[in-house]
Curated annotation (Swiss-Prot):
Protein name (database record): Large ribosomal subunit protein bL20
One GO molecular-function entry: rRNA binding
Coiled coil location: none
Gene3D superfamilies hit by this protein: 6.10.160.10, Ribosomal protein L20
SUPFAM superfamilies in the record: Ribosomal protein L20 (SSF74731)
Organism expressing this protein natively: Thermotoga neapolitana (strain ATCC 49049 / DSM 4359 / NBRC 107923 / NS-E)
GO biological process, one term: translation
Record keywords, A-Z: Ribonucleoprotein, Ribosomal protein, RNA-binding, rRNA-binding
Species classification: Bacteria, Thermotogati, Thermotogota, Thermotogae, Thermotogales
GO annotations of cellular component type: ribonucleoprotein complex; ribosome
Function of the protein: Binds directly to 23S ribosomal RNA and is necessary for the in vitro assembly process of the 50S ribosomal subunit. It is not involved in the protein synthesizing functions of that subunit.
Family to which the UniProt record says this protein belongs: Belongs to the bacterial ribosomal protein bL20 family.
């Protein structure tokens, strides 16, 4: 018996063309190109999720560095001082404090300075 695939093939093509809606030019109209771009877009989103983590950490460190330098410490000295003092707070929280609650951040800077001095 002959196997007819028309329904399944059309369904498969339609799925990729639906996902590729909004792509520019032939990328949203031609099945082969739409499929390639769909696969590539999924790869970009996967890689983007990994890069986002790096970028956020860089942003936190930059914010902490600026706030610490305003108080007279470099970022590396500040982090080292916190470790010597036994304070375990992550960079995300330090960044939030630096932006939203400068007084609390100054307290952490004071703790780090005391630990470095002793």
């Amino acid at each position: 018996m002959r196997v007819k695939r028309a329904v399944h093939a059309k369904k498969k093509r339609k799925k990729f063309l639906k996902e590729a809606k909004g792509y520019r030019g032939a990328l949203s109209r031609r099945y082969k190109l739409a499929k390639q771009m769909y696969i590539r877009s999924k790869w970009y989103s996967y890689v983007g999720r990994k890069i986002k983590k790096r970028d956020m950490r860089k942003l936190w460190i930059t914010r902490i560095n600026i706030a610490a330098r305003n108080e007279g410490l470099k970022y590396s000295e500040f982090i080292h001082g916190l470790k010597l003092a036994g304070v375990s707070i992550n960079r995300k929280m330090l960044s939030e404090l630096a932006v939203n609650d400068p007084e609390a951040f100054k307290e952490y800077v004071r703790i780090a300075k005391e630990a470095l001095a002793s």
